[in-house]
């Protein structure tokens, strides 16, 4: 099943823009919704394989290209690339589409967006899945992400572009070539000179890299303390961003938090196979 591609119009304090989203399944025939949110430098096509599985389980699956990524608009004012602005866009998407029985699955930044929604008093989410992200982000992991988020390389051919994205993404896990091909095909676009470039605005990382330059962990415990819905943390075994100590503290604060570790991955596991789908399905019920 191919995704349907649509968009909604969004705005923040500074400007209006278009946010593209992909959908799988028929809303009228689906009693539950899974909203999938990608990582900082990624886009909604990361969820193609997860979507195929959960449509068969009766879900409507929605995966946006968060503004500045994929086929969504880029912002003129980079200050608009902010977690709470992203959360407002997702809340608008949920409202415009009249989505019901919503669960959110978010990788890295996408998980932070899910947390930002879940801590709100009028939270519309039933369950939350955090893929290698939590209430405290380790400085070493932040530096690693910042080291490539500010770069915008160009490549003469797809093969070189694919090699580049693989070299950055080895922590995703030991992925088969067809998955690497899928990741690469959806990570690049041809620019006006005919060269391959990443499908994201290089300016989107400015706020993030400023925070990462402060030589300390980013702590979000005040927000986590307000999250009350059942939550699953998927932890990359070798993650440099999410520590086991952080996960343990999260569980003490919020006892409805479950944890599953994915072996031989770092930040962050790329979710696509039967094992991953079973982990998610078992939690969603």
Predicted features by range, described:
Residues 1-34, 56-59, 275, 281-285:
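Alpha/beta-hydrolase fold catalytic core
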Residues 23-71:
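Conserved HGGG/HGGXW glycine-rich cap/lid loop of the alpha/beta-hydrolase fold
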Residues 56, 63-105, 279:
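Active-site loop/oxyanion-hole signature of alpha/beta-hydrolase fold enzymes
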Residues 65-70, 134, 263-266:
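Short beta-to-alpha linker loops that shape the active-site pocket of alpha/beta-hydrolase fold enzymes
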Residues 100-139:
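Conserved hydrolase catalytic core segment
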Residues 156-210:
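Conserved alpha/beta-hydrolase catalytic His-Asp/Glu region
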Residues 191-249:
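Conserved serine/cysteine hydrolase catalytic core
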Residues 265-274:
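Catalytic histidine-centered segment of alpha/beta-hydrolase-like enzymes
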């Amino acid at each position: 099943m191919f995704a349907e591609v649509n968009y909604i119009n969004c705005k923040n304090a500074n400007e209006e823009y278009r946010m593209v989203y992909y959908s799988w399944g028929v809303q009228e025939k689906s009693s539950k919704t899974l909203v999938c949110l990608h990582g900082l430098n990624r886009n909604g096509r990361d969820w193609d394989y997860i979507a195929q599985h959960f449509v068969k389980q009766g879900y409507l699956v929605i995966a946006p290209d968060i503004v500045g990524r994929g086929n969504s608009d880029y912002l003129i004012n980079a200050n608009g690339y902010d977690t709470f602005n992203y959360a407002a866009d997702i809340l608008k998407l949920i409202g415009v589409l009249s989505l019901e029985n919503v669960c959110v699955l978010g990788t890295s930044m996408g998980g932070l967006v899910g947390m930002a929604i879940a801590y709100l008093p009028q939270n519309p989410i039933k369950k939350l899945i955090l893929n290698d992200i939590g209430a405290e982000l380790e400085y070493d992991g932040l530096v690693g992400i910042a080291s490539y988020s500010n770069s915008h390389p160009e490549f003469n051919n797809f093969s070189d572009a694919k090699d580049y994205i693989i070299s950055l993404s080895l922590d995703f896990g030991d992925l088969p070539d067809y998955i690497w091909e899928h990741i690469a095909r959806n990570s690049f676009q041809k620019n006006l000179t005919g060269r391959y470039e990443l499908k994201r605005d290089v300016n989107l990382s400015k706020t993030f890299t400023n925070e990462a330059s402060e030589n300390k962990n980013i702590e979000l415990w005040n927000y986590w303390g307000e999250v009350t819905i059942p939550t699953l943390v998927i932890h990359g075994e070798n993650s440099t961003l999410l520590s086991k100590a952080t996960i343990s503290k999260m569980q003490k604060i919020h006892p409805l938090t479950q944890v599953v570790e994915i072996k031989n991955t770092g930040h962050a596991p790329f979710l696509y196979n039967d094992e991953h789908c079973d982990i998610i399905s078992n939690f969603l019920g």
